[in-house]
Amino acid sequence: FFCVYTNNSFVKKWRTIYINTAMDTMRHQWLATYFIPKDVIDEVRYEYGLVRAATVGKESNANWGKKDDTPAGTDTPAADDNVTYINPNITHESEQTEDNTPTAEELEKQAQENFYSVFWELDRTSMEAYLAEHPDTLANGWDQIYINEAGFDDEGTSIQSIFGEQVLAIDAKDGVLLLRISGKGYRGVLAVGKDPSRLSIEMATTLGTAGQLSGTIAEAHNGVLAMNANGFLDPNGAGNGGLLAGYTMSNGTAYGDHFSAYAYKRIELHEDNLFYIKDALSPVSEDCTDAAEFTPALIVDGKKIMDDYWTGEQPRACIGQSENYEILMLVIEGRYPLEGILGTSVNNCSEILLQHKCMQAINLDGGSSAMLWFDGEYVTQSSSSPLRYTGGRPLPNAWVYKKAE
């Protein structure tokens, strides 16, 4: 009785988190309704609605990615103009010989600098130490570096990011970096895709009947990196991923219906290869090519959107874009209390993304749907024990980052 009705700040905080966590699920609402009176639940949900209403209208500035000297309305940045590619043949004039032909040493040095320019997150000292221990890594040049120790049976590399994160994988050709994200009670992976022009939403070929695993969808579309996109209808927890929840767009083709709840958001990928956050009930932009809807928005125009109600420790999936236009895919594992892996809040996800210069980001469907796949294998574990190592639940669609051609 005390825990149900008291206004003690500590108890009230965790009671609110418990109620909202239960009520935001499709099959576990009974965890709240079974023993908590309706009037208490209604009060919590009313306050929840007020907080969600406060996010309505918080949308991305249409010019957020334009350079200071770019005229308004110009469709930039296009990927070819604004993404730094690894090119070992680029040389500076001051580094060339008298006949303007760069030496082999100069080419090697420039290729090295190109690599560190693209993968700016890497701690150079630990990277050089790794290369000294594994010289074959450079056998095909800096632009062909491929390191993958992200699998379930791998321990990761000895390389660190400048933020102290463990590096799990580097794919220089495809422009992909995987980092181990961890903290008190949570563990996950942040994937960084350096070229936003290679991202799209791809649909399950069996949409309407059943879903497919994110890796299956990715492999069908030349993907090297993938994560879940939209949620799906899950009556009694028995959904098979075939019934799309909300609206999505895949390569210019629209599917589903917009969420009618005012608190939902849509993340749109436009022809300029930039993400934009919009209200789900706002018109879809004419130059939108791909989109997904969920809630809440995490970051809009580089500013964290504080959320006082999605504060439970849960498995999370988030997608965003940095000020360098990199695609950020974050998946946090959870629901393994005996291992100390519970999950985290959306606010903490925002902090992780902001550290990587995120400008726009949204929370996606979490739980057992939250999965990250890289180059033929899943690199995060599902929160559902039976599906832990098998790719999680089937999905209606996935964000797919494609291989370099």
Residue ranges and their predicted role:
Residues 1-405:
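Gly/Ser/Thr/Pro-rich low-complexity, intrinsically disordered segments
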